[in-house]
């Protein structure tokens, strides 16, 4: 098991515990409480997948955070916060690409958590790129405005957008929705790649093919799921 995966889970467990204490003192607003509930479900799922006890992971996460805070000077902390807390808005798409109307010959739609995934399953054997406009904080995707799938000819063949009835979404929500979209498009033998900007801030990584770091098994599973559920 990757040590980074374990330590990330441990820190996330401790930070969730801190946020829970904030909520218990009636200091959290509605979006804060909504994220707290959704993150709790996510942590339970991750804990089950990793085979880790959440209570133990929380204690270890506390030690990791305390060590970092002890080693970091106040001045370094101030500089980090000043640069990281400034939310940035990044654009893969032009205004025209975002606002352009499009239609589907074989429309398919799926609600993936707080996001809506739409695609045209009539599209086959195309090279497709996913572009998105979104905000970033702490060098991680914070809020997705709109994601669209484009063919080499510029036609729009898929889209992911937030549901107005579900305020707020996480980075994991976006990645899961992208997985559904990619699985559906690849089912029809399309080749899908993700823009470099989206790779960098959604996955904090990239690869030569332009695809997110899904394994072959994951892609096959997503394609099968998409066929039956979308």
Curated annotation (Swiss-Prot):
InterPro entries: NS1, NS1A, NS1A_effect_dom-like_sf, uS15_NS1_RNA-bd_sf. It is found in: Host nucleus; Host cytoplasm. It comes from the Viruses. GO terms for molecular function: protein serine/threonine kinase inhibitor activity; RNA binding. Residues 223-230 are annotated as: PABPN1-binding. Coiled coil: none annotated. Upon interferon induction, ISGylated via host HERC5; this results in the impairment of NS1 interaction with RNA targets due to its inability to form homodimers and to interact with host EIF2AK2/PKR. Inhibits post-transcriptional processing of cellular pre-mRNA, by binding and inhibiting two cellular proteins that are required for the 3'-end processing of cellular pre-mRNAs: the 30 kDa cleavage and polyadenylation specificity factor/CPSF4 and the poly(A)-binding protein 2/PABPN1. In turn, unprocessed 3' end pre-mRNAs accumulate in the host nucleus and are no longer exported to the cytoplasm. Cellular protein synthesis is thereby shut off very early after virus infection. This is Non-structural protein 1. The gene is NS.
């Amino acid at each position: 098991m990757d040590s980074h995966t374990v330590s990330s889970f441990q820190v996330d467990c401790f930070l969730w515990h801190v946020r829970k204490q904030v909520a218990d003192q009636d200091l959290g607003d509605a979006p804060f409480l909504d994220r707290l509930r959704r993150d709790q479900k996510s942590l339970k799922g991750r804990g089950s997948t990793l085979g880790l006890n959440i209570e133990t992971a929380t204690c270890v996460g506390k030690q990791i955070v305390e060590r970092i805070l002890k080693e970091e000077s106040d001045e370094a902390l101030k500089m980090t916060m000043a640069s990281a807390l400034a939310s940035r808005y990044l654009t893969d798409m032009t205004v025209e690409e975002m606002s352009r109307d499009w239609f589907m010959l074989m429309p398919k739609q799926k609600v993936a958590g707080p996001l809506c995934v739409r695609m045209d399953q009539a599209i086959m054997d195309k090279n497709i790129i996913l572009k998105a406009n979104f905000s970033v904080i702490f060098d991680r995707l914070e809020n997705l405005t709109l994601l669209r799938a484009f063919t080499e000819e510029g036609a729009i063949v898929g889209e992911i957008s937030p549901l107005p009835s579900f305020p707020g979404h996480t980075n994991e929500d976006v990645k899961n929705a992208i997985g559904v979209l990619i699985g559906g498009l690849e089912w029809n033998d399309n080749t899908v790649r993700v823009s470099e900007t989206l790779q960098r801030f959604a996955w904090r990584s990239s690869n030569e093919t332009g695809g997110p770091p899904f394994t072959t098994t994951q892609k096959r599973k997503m394609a099968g799921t998409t066929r039956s559920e979308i």
